[in-house]
Amino acid sequence: MWSGHRADLFGEPNQEIKKIMKLLNSLYRIVSESVTESGRDYNIVLDAEHFIYKAHFPGEPITPGVCIMQIAVELLSLHCGKPLAIDTVKNIKFLKIISPAETPGVCFSVSKVEAEDSKVKAQVSVSGGGETYAKLSLICKAK
């Protein structure tokens, strides 16, 4: 189990990556990270008390799609070891809502990562409790 500090596994993220990690240790924290055959899994816990959930939606918190995308980019940046930004969203499917009250822990699975020039293609699947919440196919560029 990861204590929340990347140094436990692979060393501290560099300063450039830290700059783009807008939601890490705020909206979510990483509880474990593991290498898989197809990429890497990041098990995260969402903070149901985060101010985003006060507005989206009061009494019925739902993780906004834009936050799911940002978390995916942050975790892909960690995976690649460099800061990335979305260049193109090839495909995105939000299959079920993610409520931090009902499902505080989810897994972001980063796979099919291909680096070409200054761009990185990847697929990210968000799942937990036997459910798939979202699937993203992204092309990111180095920041």
What does each model-found stretch correspond to?
Residues 5-8, 14:
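Intrinsic-disorder-associated, low-complexity terminal segments enriched in Asp/Asn/His/Tyr and depleted
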Residues 15-19:
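Charged/polar low-complexity intrinsically disordered segments
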Residues 22-63:
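Catalytic strand-loop segment that frames the active site of acyl-thioester-processing enzymes
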Residues 29, 111-143:
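HotDog/MaoC-like acyl-thioester-processing domains
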Residues 46, 94, 140-142:
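Hydrophobic residues in beta-strands and at strand termini
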Residues 59-64, 68-69, 73:
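Compact, glycine-rich, soluble single-domain proteins
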Residues 73-111, 119-121, 137:
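Hydrophobic beta-strand-centered segment that forms part of the acyl-chain substrate-binding groove
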